[in-house]
């Protein structure tokens, strides 16, 4: 769980997302409140419910990007799901309780990594012994082992190939639900793995280099030192208290006025979401999980429908409303130049792999922003995503010929931008299909 203050969270989001200060503030406060709640007296802690958020704004203004960056910052179980992927209980498809089961799986992964880090030093010692066993055998004299140990630590044997035995992770195939027992998920071909574990675990032989073997061996030895029951218990607790669910495209399940057919199913998904958002208990293969304190952040463009088209009960469970504003020319300029992984920086780095030095003048950046704004206003407003389309069009020739132009420098100015997309941007009929 992150201990960042709201101001630190906002400044971290500012590195990747331009503008939308209100939305950043809302998620920063919500994230900080998770930490504040943990500091309370247990009797009061259960009474403090998360204030769920509804983000409203056109496509391409940063709703999904805020969720992606928040996931990395949170240090807590976090899952982003599309509301349109789920169907009403009784219909073919995934039911909404699967969201919580997937969230627990994320929690299991986080806790397991944390536990592995705690025992890494001890696991490294055991891994080194196993590498030595593979190199000199188990019957070698102590002097021989020490001689090889010194070479191993000096990196002299890094490229030598050895055979090691590591735990077999199974087929990795999906599973199926046991009828009448939601959450009781059985792997299709993992029954043999279950029996294998009961008889001491299955292993497989792998041929690899000494250096590469450490990753598998340290993971193997770490897993022997950690208790799976403790991991499951901690993951369920972490999911219940710190879990965050980001529900994207919530506007697509809003029933429109006079809607028939699909609208009924959409309303069914909303009704199924209600208990989840308010607080219920979901059965998972790791035990029951309470959703009372899981934070839900919903987002949608609401082009066709409006937030008031959602079920009144669901609206009431999303008390914090944040509106994200459309992007203007200055925002596009800043997106191209100021963000940590800006498009211009990405394209420069890509061209540097071909020994091509790519430079953009200030007026070129202005021209790119102008074209993006014009297309968004005349064709369809897709926000910052328009910049990727325009940039690809401008750099098409350079990307194609880059291998033949290694060692040269290319400067892109406003004239170059206009030459490659200017005419097309002015012709609205054409740009509908090409940009």
Swiss-Prot record:
Domain of life the protein comes from: Bacteria
Alphabetized InterPro entries for the sequence: AAA+_ATPase, ATP-dep_Clp_protease_ClpX, ATPase_AAA_core, Clp_ATPase_C, HslU, P-loop_NTPase
Cited Gene3D superfamilies: 1.10.8.60, DNA helicase RuvA subunit, C-terminal domain, P-loop containing nucleotide triphosphate hydrolases
MF (Gene Ontology): ATP binding; ATP hydrolysis activity; peptidase activity; proteasome-activating activity
One Gene Ontology term, aspect cellular component: HslUV protease complex
Pfam families registered for this protein in UniProt: AAA, AAA_2
PANTHER family the UniProt entry points to: ATP-DEPENDENT CLP PROTEASE ATP-BINDING SUBUNIT CLPX-LIKE, MITOCHONDRIAL-RELATED, ATP-DEPENDENT PROTEASE ATPASE SUBUNIT HSLU
Oligomeric and partner information: A double ring-shaped homohexamer of HslV is capped on each side by a ring-shaped HslU homohexamer. The assembly of the HslU/HslV complex is dependent on binding of ATP.
Name listed for the protein in its UniProt record: ATP-dependent protease ATPase subunit HslU
Originating organism: Rhizobium leguminosarum bv. trifolii (strain WSM2304)
Lineage per the UniProt record: Bacteria, Pseudomonadati, Pseudomonadota, Alphaproteobacteria, Hyphomicrobiales
Gene this protein is translated from: hslU
